[in-house]
Regions:
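Conserved phosphate-binding catalytic cores of ATP/NTP-utilizing and phosphoryl-transfer enzymes
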Residues: 1-7, 194-226, 388, 394-399, ...
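Gly/Thr-rich phosphate-binding beta-strand-loop-beta motif of the actin/hexokinase/Hsp70
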Residues: 2-32, 102, 210-251, 296, ...
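Acidic, glycine/GT-rich loop-and beta-edge segments that sit at the periphery of enzyme/chaperone cores
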Residues: 3-6, 14-16, 37, 217-220, ...
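Phosphate-binding loop and its immediate beta->loop->alpha context
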Residues: 34-186, 196, 267-312, 317, ...
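Phosphate/ATP-binding catalytic cores across multiple sugar-kinase/actin-like superfamilies
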Residues: 137-156, 204-216, 344-405, 424, ...
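Glycine-rich phosphate-binding loops at beta-strand->alpha-helix junctions
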Residues: 164-179, 291, 317-322, 329-330, ...
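Conserved phosphate-binding/catalytic loops in two-lobed NTP-binding clefts
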Residues: 187-200, 369, 425-452
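Acidic low-complexity intrinsically disordered segments
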Residues: 190, 318-390, 464-480
Length: 480
């Protein structure tokens, strides 16, 4: 971070499917609270609106595909690509011009991540960019949006001058971390600290629980963080020890980069709804399936937000001249939602369960390695089985009780036996901003090469420093 504390501490969640930004005004002192930045973006040709999230999609239109000025932004009238909501919508119609999952491509060891390979499988004559450049453009959009909203008349408030906490998956290797920092610097950000996403969730839980966290964890415990995001699932295991009379937290294990998350759940709900339409002789095309996925996501969120609802509507626009008249309507019942989500993604399984692996047949095509088994509980069981030795060495088998210490990600199970899946608010960037401020943003580094402090990871560095959260937090969070 910067040698001199900045006015704002900013958290950026550079997600697989959505990006977000939140900040804390350090001038507010103890009354400081994280604030989400509404992000201006193109939502229709020529229409810019503010949204709480920036979808991690980038659209590269073909020649004469859109009218002149369709992609202009308040700060750039000549923009020739789209990032965000319109990119996602238009990409559903022309997928060969849509860049998605850039974050997962950024950690793919089988490709040159600086090479222009995205959109994947696009024709040779199509516009392409690298996974690195896609990350640069997402971050650049956030920088431009911040400066437009927050720093029109104050150069010292520009995002380039603020202390930035930028998340990375715990499963990112050193190369992917270095590329993330390279992308941030290319977007103009210099005062960067990388923070692993599960650790961000853990810090946010500590801050939110105040001193109550001490009653939930003690020496000899293990804390399992299961971060189910929009496109990936990240698993981290933290052991609770003691050092000079204070609790010490050591990260002992990290899971694989599992391409499985909330988007998969929405897609599964869409396929279930499509079968209902098919039974009525209504067959949806690819674009309508994309619309159905968005509608199912909205219906799912309504059902989670209001437990009294038995169902929520889903709609898909018809095709042809009479679009409104041809609107396809249906509903997603709570029973069907629970059946799909719990049965498909959170089924009961034995402790030694293993996710089903797709059988390799002949030559395998290069691409993203999506999880072949959607059961997150099986991936979790396999992770814990692999870490049995580490658990045996560091965790004391006492008390015989298991305690959830927090929730997060896309969905959590309310009950282990057939209960409803409850929504868990994923605070994302807001957690980062709050956690960073709670730690004082405090032990700072100067310039690109400084050491990492405050329990965060310097780009690719294998060491971590002391953490000093407010209200007597853990003394150390380090890697084993």
């Amino acid at each position: 971070m910067s040698a001199t504390p900045s006015r704002y501490v900013v958290g950026i969640d550079l997600g697989t499917t959505n990006c977000s930004l939140a900040y804390v005004d350090t001038g507010a002192g103890e009354d400081a609270r994280p604030v989400d930045l509404s992000i201006p973006q193109v939502v229709q040709p020529g229409v810019v609106e503010e949204r709480p999230l920036l979808p991690s999609f980038l659209y590269l239109p073909g020649p004469n595909e859109l009218p002149a000025g369709s992609l202009k932004l308040p700060w750039d009238a000549g923009r020739d690509y789209a990032v965000g909501e319109f990119a996602r919508q238009q990409g559903s119609l022309v997928p060969t011009r849509l860049v998605s999952s850039a974050k997962s491509w950024l950690c793919h060891p089988g490709i040159d991540r600086r090479a222009a390979v995205l959109p994947w499988k696009a024709p040779d004559n199509a516009r392409k960019i690298s996974p690195l450049e896609a990350s640069v453009r997402y971050l650049k959009h956030l920088v431009e949006a911040w400066n437009f909203r927050m720093a029109k008349d104050r150069a010292e408030y520009r995002l380039e001058q603020q202390d930035i906490i930028l998340t990375v998956p715990a499963s990112f290797d050193a190369a992917a971390r270095e590329l993330t920092v390279e992308a941030a610097r290319a977007a103009g950000l210099e005062h960067i600290t990388l923070l692993e996403e599960p650790q961000s969730a853990f810090y946010a839980w500590i801050e939110a629980s105040h001193d109550a966290w001490r009653k939930q964890v003690e020496v000899g415990d293990a804390v399992l963080i299961c971060d189910v995001g929009g496109g990936t699932t990240d698993l981290t295991l933290i052991a609770v020890g003691e050092e000079t009379g204070q609790l010490a937290l050591t990260r002992v294990a990290v899971g694989d980069h599992i391409l499985l998350g909330g988007d998969n759940m929405d897609l599964a709900l869409a396929h279930s709804a499509a079968q209902t339409f098919l039974a009525k002789n209504i067959k949806l095309d690819a674009a309508q399936m994309m619309m159905l996925g968005h509608s199912c996501r909205a219906a799912k969120e309504k059902l989670f937000a209001d437990p009294s609802l038995a169902s929520a509507p889903v709609t898909v626009l018809g095709r042809g001249s009479k679009v409104i008249a041809g609107t396809i309507k249906g509903e997603l019942s709570r029973a069907e939602m629970e059946k799909v989500l719990i049965g498909g993604f959170f089924p009961d399984c034995p402790p030694d369960a293993e996710p089903t692996k797709q059988r390799a047949v002949g030559l395998q095509e290069l691409g993203l390695l999506y999880a072949s088994d959607p059961a997150i509980t099986k991936h979790l069981a396999a992770f814990l089985t692999r870490q049995a030795q580490a658990l045996a060495e560091r965790v004391q088998p006492k008390r015989g009780k298991k305690k959830p210490v927090g929730d997060g990600g896309a969905v959590q199970r309310r009950r282990l036996q057939g209960g409803a899946a409850a929504p868990a608010r994923a605070d994302g960037a807001q957690s980062l901003a709050q956690g960073a401020h709670a730690q004082g943003a405090g032990e700072r580094r100067s310039g690109p090469g400084g050491g990492a402090r405050g329990g965060v990871l310097r780009h690719g560095a294998a060491r971590q420093g002391r953490a000093h959260p407010r209200r007597g937090g853990p003394r150390v969070l380090r890697r084993h």
